[in-house]
Structure formats: C-alpha cells, structure tokens
Amino acid sequence: MKKLICLFAVFLMLCGRAFALDANDLLPPEKAFVPELAVADDGVNVRFRIADGYYMYQAKIVGKTDPADLLGQPSFSKGEEKEDEFFGRQTVYHHEAQVAFPYAKAVGEPYKLVLTYQGCAEAGVCYPPVDTEFDIFGNGTYHPQTDEPASAKDRFLQPSSQNGSGALPPPKGDEGGDSRFKLSWDTLNANLLAFFLAGLGLSFTACMYPLLPIVSSIVVGDKKAGKARAFVLSVVYVQGLALTYTLVGIVAGLTGALLTVWLQQAWVVLAASALMVVLALSMFGLFNIQLPNAVQSYFQNQSSRLSGGKIVSVFIMGILSALIVGPCVAPPLAFALGYIGQTGDAVLGGLALYTLALGTGVPLIAIGTFGGHILPKAGDWMNAVKYAFGFILLAVAVYLATPHLPYYLVVALYTLLMLVPAFMLLVNGRRQKRRPKAVAFALGGILLIGGAWFGWQGANGKTTALHHFLTLNPPAEAGKSSEHGKMFADTAALKAAMDTALKEHPDKPVVLDFYADWCISCKEMAAYTLNQPEVHQAVDMERFFQIDVTANTPEHQALLKEYGLFGPPGVFVVRSDGSRSEPLLGFVKADKFIEWYEQNR
C-alpha cells in the first residue's frame, strides 16, 4: 500500500481479532446502517446512522423510484479513502453518511423509494446488499414499507457479479468492475504508460495519416524555422490535439458515478459488449465510422485558413485536427472512455486521455521536426495494426460479457481469439518479405501454441492462473473441486453433498465456508489462508465445502439465517449428529485457522 497503509494495517489487525469474535457481537444490517429521510420540495435527503465498528461504501448507495426516473444524480457528503488490496481505492463512511437525491422532474403524486446500500463490519464480515423501501407522500412525509429490508426478488436493481451469480463486488474506486483493470491513483504510472502506448499504437493506423499534411504546413508556414523551432511548433500542435482528448476524458470521469450504477445491470453490460463487437467489425473494414463529409470539409477548411508558424494558430489547428480524426479512432477511444468512466474522477480521466493523445502525437512531432522521410511507407502493415485493435476490442467484448456467459463458452471464445489471428499471420506471412515474414511467423506460432494450450486446458477442466484471470472463475458446476474445497452456488446441491459426505464417513466432520465476491475478508482467506500447504495437510479439502452467496438469493439468505450469519465470511465444522461449531468469523491466518479447526473437529 502506498497511501493509508497505516489505516489498512489497523484494518488487518481488527480482522485478525475475528478468531475470538462471536456471531452475537455483530449487529443485524438494519441496526448497523439506519437510513433517515428528510423529504423536501426539491428532493430527498438521506442520512445513514452507522454503528461504531462498521462502515458503508459510497458507490453502493443507490436510490430507485417507482414510478422510475424521478431522481437525478445524487451528491454525497465527503467520505474517507480506504485502500483495499483486492478491490482498490474505496470511498467509505464511518458513523454517518449523507446523500442528497434531487428530483429530476416535478413530483406531484406519492411514490415508492428503494434505497440500496452495502457495508461491512471492521471485524471482517461484509453484509450482502440491503434494499429498504419507503412510501413517499406529497406532504413531505414518508413511511417505511416494512421493518425488514426488501427481499432480493423485490429489487428494482439487480447488480451483476463477476462470476455471473448476481451481486457486484464492492466498488472499485468503483466492482465494478473489475479489479484486474482499474484506473486509480495507486496504479497511475502503469495506467498512464498503458494509455501512452495505446496512443502510440493508434498513431500507426491510417487514421493519423490525414494529419501529416497539416503538420507539414505548420513547419512550411515558418520558412526560417530550424529543427528547434519546428520541434516547438509540432509540440504546440500536439498540445492542441491533446486538449480536445483531455476534455473528453474529463467528461467521462465526471459521468463515472452514473456509469457505475448503469454497469451494474446485466442488459447494459451485454449491450456494451455488443457495441465492442460492432466497433471491432469497423476495424476489420466492414464499415467506416466517420463524420459526414460536409462536417469534415468544414473543419478542414477552417484549419487551412489558419497560418502556420504562429503559436496560437498552430494550437487551434491541433484542436480542429482532433475533430477531423476523432471519428476514425472512435472504436478504441470508446473502450478507453468506458474504462475511464468507472473511476468517477475527472482529473484521472483527463490525465489518461491527455497521455493517450501524447502517444498519438509522438510520430507527428517526429515528422514535423525531422521531415517526412522518416515515416514508414503506407502498406499492409497499417491494416495489420487496425486488425490488431479489432481483435483487442473483441477480447474486451468477451471480457465484459464473461460474468453472464458459461465458463466453457468463454474459454472457447478466447481460444478463437488466439487461433484466428494466428492462422491469419501464418497464411499472410508467406507473402511478405523476409523480416516481416519472420515476425508474422513468430507471432502466429506463439498465438497458435498459446490458443491450443488454453483451449485444451480449459476443455479438460484444468484451470491455470491465466484461466482464472480471463474467465474470472473456474467452471461453475456444483461441487467442482479446487484448492479451496468444493464450491456450490445452489443450496440444495450443497446440502445433498454434505449429507452424502457425512453418511459415508460419520466419524469425520465436514467444513462449511460461506463466501461472496463482494466480501473482502473472503478474498483474504482465499489468498492467504485456504491455499496454504499446512492448511491442506490439516484439513481434508474433499470434505471442505464452500457456498457462494454472492447472488444473495432468498435461498442464500435463508441459509445464512439458518447458520446465524448476517453475511460472509463464516466457517463452521459440521458433524454427522447435526451439531456444528461456533463460527469462525473474519480473516485469520493459517496457524489460527488450523488451531480453530483442531479445537472443533
């Protein structure tokens, strides 16, 4: 951790105390997080009273109404930055959180408000998302519909998870989405480098070649310019180009909170995935995305009227050039904007797109400074760059849709995304000259071997680190064995498997572990405890059962209630006579886990 490491260390120490934590020490969610409403003419203000030792996630606070769309964009009170190893930087609240939901339109009739929120206990237990419903009346009063949180089946908003089971992990600067690719201040250098390299890649597509005459005119406009002057003018031109991209990035960052809420819905995620496929097809040349000819001509005429050699004129040329070339690079730019939008940070968004523009502008600066003779000649290699971006966009489409697709279909799609370009490189490489042919054969061979290996491993149920990374989770069949035992999402299948194990060996207990994707301590247990060799030596992992309650279905809620839990993690030793141990709550290290198990087996 780079910042807040002391706070995070305190958090881990509190989690470590969970070995002595009793389930009775935890408050039910309706007492840990208590919403109070103030209904005004212009909106609804919500104040959450948060019990000591608990905290809430800002990005998990959502308001929905019936009739729909009565509320505008919410504003939040200032929260605290919490750094999490698994989910990145989070904004959380202790003690109190205030949210203002303005009305988006006139409200004259009573309506129903559903507040969705989620939080955790500092001791290491996370609660499932809670829905609380209120009837709002026109005279400024309100009434809770029930004393209990709304059930999952009554939700207006059904968050989607990264394993397809239904609930989104805690916000990533936010789950959403996904912690594998997160733009945050802690990963700023790596992310800016990635955006710079992406911009550099875009500069080698045919999209940027219309800008070369403009760059040449910049230098020609100052006939006495040496290389130093030409360099300065080229840099100023690229800064104008970058300004347009930066403003777009800022807008994407400002709308990030809205994108986060929308991206929790399956249909939005799948629509975004379909859009990536369409954009990829444009990179393969099936159709072109461009401004109407009349609009393009207007911007080109305005640019040509500006005289070269003058700083202000050159800067404005750069701005207009971004508008000319922008639609041509729309497919990869659309992905970049969606990626930035998850941050909700205007500064980060602006920095990311500014860096992308700088990468795009490097060859333009080189051309303006040293002349066009250093530019590679146009040819098939430019199409190869476009095709590469097309396959990247297809991979992004699969990545977005992964939580909603069967495991083996995801494996098959990724396999095709490696094998198809491999065959294209191997077939087309034969027509190239010696050096391009060698490069094409090398890349094609790597992709061919990698694709065949990835597909074979996935088809045989052998999940490697790459499979976990790309597919988010191993096959979701009930009872699939892993290094963490047997994972179930269906409670009936879990109970049947546990009953069978206890009947076969009544003298041996089984272990039941409650898990969820949005549970930080569950991730810690998986990463630092359950995968340790000493745990596998002490515990028979064939008798270790995990129930994935990420979806928080009514069946999951009933099972949690049956075992006296408000949320995961919770580990029990269950015996053949029907008795079970007190739960192990929160994160503990391997030695403490083994000690607890030996005491309760």
Curated annotation (Swiss-Prot):
| Annotated Gene Ontology cellular component terms | plasma membrane
Q: Which stretches of this protein does UniProt put in the Cytoplasmic compartment?
A: 213-242, 288-310, 368-380, 428-437
The Swiss-Prot or TrEMBL record describes its family as follows: Belongs to the thioredoxin family. DsbD subfamily.
Annotated EC: 1.8.1.8
- Provide the protein's localization: Cell inner membrane
What domain of life is recorded for the organism? Answer: Bacteria
Organism for this UniProt entry: Neisseria meningitidis serogroup B (strain ATCC BAA-335 / MC58)
One Pfam annotation reads Thioredoxin_2
Q: Which UniProt keywords apply?
A: Cell inner membrane, Cell membrane, Cytochrome c-type biogenesis, Disulfide bond, Electron transport, Membrane, NAD, Oxidoreductase, Redox-active center, Signal, Transmembrane, Transmembrane helix, Transport
Q: What is this protein called?
A: Thiol:disulfide interchange protein DsbD
Give the transmembrane ranges: 192-212, 243-263, 267-287, 311-331, 347-367, 381-401, 407-427, 438-458
